[in-house]
Amino acid sequence: MRKAIFSFLFSILTVLAFAQGRQIEIRSSELVKGFQASGFARIIRPVFVHEGSTLASDSADFNQTANTFEAFGHVVITQPSGTVIYSDHLNYDGNTKLAVLTNKVKLIDGDATLTTDHLTYNMTTKIGTYTGGGKIVNGKNVLTSKNGYYFETSRDSYFRYDVVLTSPDALIKTDTLRYNSTTKIAYFYGPTNIYGKDDTLYTENGTYN
């Protein structure tokens, strides 16, 4: 069951990965250190616009020909949906619409906040993935795992390996879990221990609200 779920996830993550994107535009900047024949420029305080999203940072190396840029310092991605992503560093490809964010990454989607040190975010599918540890805080619920997949559209999160869900009423440990930030319901797909205030429960398939 778990293999089928994550095979499905990876197939979704690759959808449109190589679709040709529109050209990245510069909305504003403090300084542009000349475009060379290669189309490369160093930009200070840039605000980029790409297919409805704005991407800002302290500085960026922009390759207009390749339709990519590398951004440094106080990176902020704001999407039309209202979701905002912060980080210290960003590599963005306008052709695939893939954003690779590193160092102090924070994704805020309404009342759900995801933090990690490395996040790959697909601006087309609106799916974010981490494989080096991450945390999602949703109200009073806190979820941590080694690997995580956040689906902005459905607000579903899939967690894999060393998964821990901490809620006011219980501590849950498992290796595979799905959680919805709107309903706050957790779904288990493998060996799971639920430690309540008065008892402990073991299960391999079920839900927790």
Please tell me what each predicted stretch does:
Residues 1-24:
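Bacterial Sec-dependent N-terminal signal peptides
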Residues 20-209:
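N-terminal amphipathic/hydrophobic interface segments
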